[in-house]
């Protein structure tokens, strides 16, 4: 405080007035009055600054003694692997296509006629039904297979498919009629040989074979 009073005494009147204005004090009076005002102001504020330093010191001590809380890392739940295994099973089941269904799709792709038995087998394999043919259906399926073979052969050699199918149907009807009336269909008799020769000639004329 002694040094401050010495400094205030060294100041001029104009400088003392500026110091009073800076601190919000009155500038009226002589030099000695201004010095007293400034000294009283400095003493009051010196006590306040000391109190503030004490308070700030207490706060810093509390901050230093307060423990630092580290953030606790939450444990992540394990990933579910059940769904992945189930998806793999589904993919494996769908990839196994029955062989009969493959044959049917291949026949449709290349425009090859599929027999009735293969269609039934594919359908039975798709729906899980036993594909055991009955006695009544076994005899009817044979001419269908032969007819399909004739159609394939006719398409291969560029022949008329409708005429071949009609010829096979006529032969089948004639065969059934002979079986019904007990007519022998062996090639030993002369009548049967003439019939076969006539059929051969008609067939050659129909397809333009010399």
UniProtKB/Swiss-Prot annotation:
GO biological process assignments: mRNA export from nucleus; negative regulation of transcription by RNA polymerase II; poly(A)+ mRNA export from nucleus; regulation of translation
Transcription regulation keyword on record: yes
Tissue specificity field: Low expression in spleen, liver, pancreas, testis, thymus, heart, and kidney. Increased levels are seen in hepatocellular carcinoma and pancreatic adenocarcinoma.
Compositional bias segments (type: Basic and acidic residues): 65-86
Residues recorded as bearing N-acetylalanine in the entry: 2
A molecular function GO annotation: RNA binding
Modified residues (Phosphoserine): 163
Record's compositionally biased regions (Polar residues): 184-193
Superkingdom of the source species: Eukaryota
Modification type N6-acetyllysine: residues: 10, 142
Record's subunit section: Interacts with DDX39A. Interacts with FUS. Interacts (via the C-terminal domain) with DDX39B; the interaction is direct and facilitates RNA binding of DDX39B. Component of the transcription/export (TREX) complex at least composed of ALYREF/THOC4, DDX39B, SARNP/CIP29, CHTOP and the THO subcomplex; TREX seems to have dynamic structure involving ATP-dependent remodeling; in the complex interacts directly with DDX39B in a ATP-dependent manner which bridges it to ALYREF/THOC4.
Protein name according to UniProt: SAP domain-containing ribonucleoprotein
Organism: Homo sapiens
